[in-house]
Curated annotation (Swiss-Prot):
Name the UniProt record assigns to this protein: Pantothenate kinase
Family affiliation: Belongs to the prokaryotic pantothenate kinase family.
Catalytic activity entry: (R)-pantothenate + ATP = (R)-4'-phosphopantothenate + ADP + H(+)
Lineage: Bacteria, Pseudomonadati, Pseudomonadota, Alphaproteobacteria, Hyphomicrobiales
Originating gene: coaA
Keywords: ATP-binding, Coenzyme A biosynthesis, Cytoplasm, Kinase, Nucleotide-binding, Transferase
Pathway this chain belongs to: Cofactor biosynthesis; coenzyme A biosynthesis; CoA from (R)-pantothenate: step 1/5
Source species of the chain: Mesorhizobium japonicum (strain LMG 29417 / CECT 9101 / MAFF 303099) (Mesorhizobium loti (strain MAFF 303099))
Cell compartment(s), UniProt: Cytoplasm
Gene3D superfamilies the UniProt entry points to: P-loop containing nucleotide triphosphate hydrolases
UniProt GO cellular component terms: cytoplasm
Amino acid sequence: MDQLAQTEKYSPFRFFSAEQWSRFRADTPLTLSEDEFRRLRSLNDPVDLEEVKRIYLSLSRLLSAHVEASQLLFRQRQAFFNAVDIVKTPFIIGIAGSVAVGKSTTARVLKELLARWPSSPKVDLITTDGFLLPNEVLRRENLMERKGFPDSYDVGALLRFLSGIKSALPDVRAPVYSHLTYDVIPGEFVTIDRPDILIFEGINVLQPGKLPQDGKIVPFLSDFFDFAIYIDADEKLIHEWYISRFMRLRETAFRNPDSFFHRYSQLSEEAARAIAEGLWSNINLKNLRENILPTRARADLILRKGADHLVEEVALRKL
């Protein structure tokens, strides 16, 4: 985060080492067991319960404070409008960052920690994968090699979904994506029914659109977020994690004959690694540099990872 921390005096962020951040846990209890955490962890992600204690319990405590403040503001607005029939809207947490940086593990761990607060809030988790355009459309538009780039998503559907959630509508539907077939599953949806908290995870969720010249209101996804988190790491580390994950998948999920990537499991290790390097260089690295990393400074909190996926530094936006 060198560019963000050049002079903290003029930065919109406060910076903490992992050790400093861990002290903010206070008396927040660890409510996850080793077995539960193991089920939440993504493939090739070595994060353990010690990291949850060190980083995520403090983050859970911080988010609890933000949710509590949001609820207080809601009650004050009710009084301001002299209205009691206004429906409380969900608190939305956006999580962004590169492919292979550990967003999914972070999102799942936070979901479990937040749901176990004493108030027992209803917490749901949605990823942007289901909002990718179907492969048939991507092929027709010559976008298959830009899958994951902003133009490969159904932005209208994303905005309608988040608008429905923020409007406290019941039974808002999100499409479902299959990592086995590498495609949206036709006609399959997950229903989100007025959660207290929604975690919305995806590589480009902090991506702003082009500002209209005529001043019309054009919402960005992040306009619906109450708190945004960016998972950060050095480019070289993300590259290592991506290649390592690809090679692990080659030995596991890719061996399924129904897998979109099954053909890669038939290649030699050298050939498979060359494919992975090409996918990284031509697609994922390009997307990171052009679209994902530039959104980092739009987050409220940045978790900067070092080796072994362990957080080394935390940046929190000043109030």
